[in-house]
Structures are given as structure tokens and as C-alpha cells.
A protein has these predicted regions:
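His/acidic metal-ligating clusters that form di-metal
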Residues: 51-61, 96, 151-153, 165-289
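Short active-site segment of divalent metal-dependent hydrolases/proteases
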Residues: 35, 69-70, 110, 201, ...
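Extended active-site neighborhood of metal-dependent phosphoesterases/phosphodiesterases
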Residues: 5-15, 74-187, 248, 266, ...
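Active-site glycine-centered loops adjacent to acidic/histidine catalytic or metal-binding residues
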Residues: 32, 66-67, 107-108, 198, ...
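N-terminal active-site segment of His-dependent metallophosphoesterases
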Residues: 1-81
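Short, flexible/disordered intra-domain loops and linkers
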Residues: 38-42, 73-84, 114-120, 164-170, ...
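Residue-level marker for buried hydrophobic side chains located in beta-strands
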Residues: 27-29, 62-64, 104, 195, ...
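Acidic, His/Gly-rich catalytic cores of divalent-metal-dependent hydrolytic chemistry
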Residues: 338-358
Length: 358
């Protein structure tokens, strides 16, 4: 098995070298392992894949796109300490392999009881791995990082849950505080911005939430409700308007949320959005519409930039790959090159490289 990883790492390193320039930023990306333990095959293979690259690609950061955990808290009992310990175990392994920071973003499975998310819980887990390079809003789960010529903005979605409410919300929203931070702080820059978030921005709830919200009780819900609610982003239109104003260098005001956003600088633009969540690959052009009636594969890219969705690092979770993979782990390595205005996702494992010129 070690030969498989070494051979794949050699191929990937040659591909990275072919597109890398002096100003390129390099980020290994993994997402959606959905593990119960650190020793399951999917995690062992992920760690082996990362280790095969650790001494060769010299990355600027490792991006963990979320949904590290399986259905802990619903499939089986798991305490908050156990959930936090498993998350720390994953990030500890990554940090031990690479000299660079690790940048985790939370998925809907990475919180207390899963699908419920408290930002202070995630902050306490994730802040130890960014090597003090991330700029956060208090103890937030969202943050930005400045690199030479590029800002990376890591969003939290889900952002918060009101567990004490009679009918708790499933937390699929950015929330007013995060949206104000996005407009006033994270996008207050005059440089290209790389967006990072677990849930793709095109993916949205297609039905009527009112009857389903009434079934929520504490941290538990029926399986059908979970399936239907995944992807419903209640305040996505406000986020869309913020991104459009940033891209078009215009003023944006939203009194209801408390936003007055000044025009962005002349060099400001969106590079692309990086996401996971779907378990298989996809690539979306700005404004692209696809199978809009299908919650699994359809939607509209409402962002004025391309969106890359990275497949699960565990091929057993990927419906397009399960059972016929040739490499037992899947990664993307993002190569962001400001001088050429390109972002290339080099594939480690089964799948194709993808490139966008912003």
C-alpha cells in the first residue's frame, strides 16, 4: 500500500511543479472523511496520503473543509469531550506532518450532536492550529488569513444554533454577526480573495421549511427532516449581495442587518470558492445553473466567481467512486498564482485536475 501513496505523490508533485510560480500559494485540501475514530481505514489512508506529500510540496497551509466526523451524537452516543478529542486528533496529525498552519472550517457534522453548531465550541478546538495567522472576530468560527497578494476568507456554515428555543433552528445560516464581519472586515481589502466554506454556495433548500422546523426537538430530528434541511441557507441572498458588491466595487447597504459596505479597491476580486459537503466533485462557472430541480446535483452558482467542490477524502463516501477507486484517498492541492490570475486544483487520487482563470 505504501508504494501506491509514494507513486501517486511523485506524480502529483511533478504536476504541482509544472504550474507553480514564484508567487504561488499551495494548499492541500481534504474534506468529508466522516469518521468515527482515528483508526478507521478512511482516516489511515488520508493520513498516509498527506504524509506522502509532507516533505515535498512545501505548502502555505493545509485546508480542512469540514465534516470530519460521522453522525456522532445521532448514530451513537458521543460526549462533547469525545467529539472535541476526535477533531483535535485529526488536526494534531496534520500539524505534526506539516510545518505550515492548518486551517479548519466547520462542517455540519463537526459540532455538538452534529448538525447543531456552537461557534465557541469550534473556536476552542480549531484555534490551536493556525499558528496565530488567522484574524478572528472574538471567539468566532469564521476568520481571514492574509498571504502575499491574497486574502483567504474562511466562513462558518452552519454558524450557530439556538438549542434553548422551543423549535430550534437547524443552523443553516451565516447569521447577522458573520455577515456584518464579512462586509465590514473580511472584504475590506484591496486584493484578490479566496473563499473557503464547507457548504457550496449553490446548494440550497428546495422545499417549505415551516412544517419541518416544527419537528425539531433538542439535538434530534427525523432522518427525513435532516435530509431535506441539508443545504438550506436562510440568509444566502444577503451574502450573495455582499459578494456582488465586492466584485463590482459598489456600495452595499442593508439596514436590517446593520451593513454599510464601502466600495472595494480596484484590485479587489473573488478568486474562487472552495467547498466540500457533497462527497463528489463538481466545478461551477460564475452564474451557472444546473439541474435546478435536483437537490443532490442541481442548483445555481449565485457567486460572481467559480466554485470548486472537492470530493470526500474517503472514496467509500463518494457515490461516484465507491468500490472502484485506484488510490485509497482523495485530496486536492490548490495552487493559487496571483501573477497569472489562476487557481489550479491538482488531484491526488482518482479524478481530474481543474483550473480557473479569475
Amino acid at each position: 500500500m505504501s508504494t501506491v501513496f509514494a507513486t501517486e505523490a511523485s506524480r502529483v508533485c511533478k504536476r504541482i511543479d509544472a504550474v507553480r510560480r514564484k508567487d504561488s500559494l499551495v494548499f492541500p485540501i481534504f474534506t468529508d472523511p466522516h469518521t468515527h475514530t482515528l483508526t478507521e481505514d478512511g482516516m489511515e489512508n488520508l493520513f498516509a496520503a498527506l504524509a506522502s506529500l509532507a516533505n515535498t510540496i512545501k505548502p502555505d497551509g493545509v485546508i480542512a473543509l469540514g465534516d470530519n466526523l460521522a453522525m456522532l451524537g445521532r448514530e451513537c452516543h458521543a460526549t462533547n469531550d469525545e467529539i472535541a478529542g476526535l477533531l483535535r486528533g485529526i488536526f494534531d496529525r496534520c500539524a505534526a506532518m506539516f510545518a505550515c498552519p492548518v486551517y479548519p472550517v466547520n462542517g455540519n457534522h463537526d459540532g455538538i450532536g452534529t448538525d447543531f453548531f456552537k461557534p465557541d465550541f469550534w473556536y476552542a478546538v480549531s484555534r490551536a492550529y493556525d499558528q496565530n495567522t488567522a484574524v478572528r472576530e472574538g471567539e468566532s468560527a469564521y476568520y481571514y488569513v492574509d498571504f502575499p497578494g491574497v486574502r483567504m476568507v474562511c466562513l462558518s456554515l452552519p454558524s450557530d444554533s439556538e438549542l434553548a428555543a422551543e423549535h430550534p433552528t437547524p443552523a443553516w445560516e451565516y447569521g447577522d454577526a458573520q455577515l456584518r464581519w464579512l462586509a465590514h472586515t473580511a472584504l475590506a481589502c484591496d486584493c484578490p480573495v479566496l473563499l473557503v466554506m464547507h457548504v457550496p454556495f449553490y446548494y440550497e433548500y428546495l422545499g417549505d421549511p415551516v412544517p419541518m422546523l416544527g419537528t425539531w426537538n433538542g439535538t434530534h430530528a427525523t432522518e427525513s427532516t435532516i435530509a431535506a434541511l441539508c443545504g438550506w441557507i436562510a440568509d444566502r441572498d444577503v451574502a450573495k449581495e455582499i459578494f456582488a458588491a465586492f466584485q463590482n466595487h459598489t456600495v452595499y447597504d442593508n439596514a436590517a442587518v446593520g451593513i454599510h459596505m464601502a466600495p472595494s479597491g480596484a484590485r479587489a476580486c473573488l478568486i474562487a470558492a472552495l467547498s466540500g459537503h457533497m462527497h463528489n466533485d463538481s466545478f461551477w462557472l460564475p452564474g451557472e445553473k444546473r439541474n435546478t430541480g435536483d437537490v443532490e446535483s442541481g442548483g445555481t452558482n449565485a457567486l460572481p466567481c467559480a466554485q470548486f467542490v472537492t470530493a470526500s477524502s474517503n472514496p467509500a463516501v463518494n457515490p461516484d467512486l465507491r468500490g472502484h477507486e485506484t488510490v485509497p484517498a482523495t485530496l486536492d492541492i490548490a495552487v493559487v498564482t496571483p501573477c497569472e490570475r489562476t487557481i489550479t486544483l491538482v488531484r491526488y487520487g482518482d479524478g481530474e485536475d481543474r483550473m480557473w482563470h479569475w
